[in-house]
Amino acid sequence: LATAVMMDRSMTLIITDNRGFGCINRLQVGTGGAPFNNLFADSQHEVLPEIDFVAHAASMGARACKAGSIAELEALTAEAINRKGVDVIVIDTDPGPSTAAGGTWWEVGVPEVSERAEVASAYQGWLDGKKRQLG
């Protein structure tokens, strides 16, 4: 961001804040694993991090704001894409909901043998995905 501001580039970034690494958590669960240390609230911690992405972006020279709803996100995005400079729009999101498998098949290794039913099911899904990949 700082470089884009320094170089007088124009871009709009939308940061979806799910308080952790939601996409990795969904991938981990989707491959039969149990959620582990991907979402801040579920990880080992003494103090939960409260990252202020708006302040962080602004500290690097970007115009930054937080959208409180999808309608506000749409309005802020429409404004941002029509002006020069770096804009950052942050919106809080739920880390769980997503398109199936993130909208595409990821070839992520799944154990062939496991005592967990979720892993056995994920392995079968991996085999099916591999067949589709190879045609």
Give the residues covered by each predicted segment.
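Thiamine diphosphate
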Residues: 1-135
